[in-house]
Amino acid sequence: MNTDNPKSHISRIAYPAIIVFLILTLLGSLVERFHPFTSWLTPPVALLMGLAYALIFGSTHRRANKLGSKVLLQYSVVGLGFGMNLGESLASGRDGMMFTIISVFGTLLLGWFIGRKILQMNRNTSALISAGTAICGGSAIAAVGPILKAEEHEMSVALGTVFLLNAVALFIFPSIGHWLALDQQQFGTWAAIAIHDTSSVVGAGSAYGEEALRVATTIKLTRALWIVPLTLVFSFVYKTKGAKRFPVPLFILFFIGAIILNTYLLEAYFPEVGRFVASLARKGLTLSLFFIGASLTKEVIASVGVRALLQGLFLWILISVGSLAFILLI
């Protein structure tokens, strides 16, 4: 960070001040009498605040943004498990399994055709965007990148494409859901299938309702487990060796453990504890979206490029419309 730039001096004050303000507002929202003053701070608003900060001040506090957007998000997702019941979650995951299988393989095939045959993109960038769209955004890209031996700029382009579309999805999906009068189950399923990254899926579900949040989170994290077979498929198709590990996101296992603990212990003996932890986790999720927005600088947006954005956009539209039509027809 350039200390001679006046913006850098302002950002050193503004950044922690904004975070403290957000934390106090979110904690205040846990108290019922403060709701009229705190209800405005929703996940989309937090993301928008982060975007505004990034566009004004640029790339500052990268370490804090990375910790907030990844670690805080993962802790928050685990915390959401303390508000879920195992039987209901298994039912949601089972209901969404067919959508998941069709959409994962369909997205990978469409991504290959659009990226390589129509847009004539290089192999790695096209494959990374397809993987990020098919599974769970940045996590899938990070898992597949080493297998493809992708260059740093190829990873950056794919991540930038996915993050930009995620930001858009967080704003427009709840509005479309209300316009189409989707119920909580329908919207949660649609968000989990059509939105790439876990953060935006959970954010959109939270904005739509508690049941939509539960359904979306369960289906999305079930979908995220496809990272393991995805890495195996990519290793076979692209004939690459030397991938040291097939990353199973550890927070997903903790999320499952939280659901089990809540179902068999907290719901029976300490129901208030589970509800409080889940409520606190939703606040943490909202805060993590500020960090994600603050990471989307002008440089990230500029790095994407037209063809990468077109592949991501075409895939996203096809998957969104196709999955929505399927949900409405069944």
From Swiss-Prot:
Keywords, sorted A to Z: Cell membrane, Membrane, Transmembrane, Transmembrane helix
Principal place of residence: membrane
One Pfam assignment: Cons_hypoth698
Cellular compartments annotated: Cell membrane
Transmembrane regions: 13-31, 36-58, 71-93, 97-114, 126-148, 158-180, 248-270, 285-307, 312-329
Membrane topology: Multi-pass membrane protein
Organism: Porphyromonas gingivalis (strain ATCC BAA-308 / W83)
Annotated Gene Ontology cellular component terms: plasma membrane
Keyword Cell inner membrane: no
InterPro entries listed in its UniProt record: UPF0324_pro
Family indicated by similarity: Belongs to the UPF0324 family.
Protein's name according to its UniProt entry: UPF0324 membrane protein PG_2004
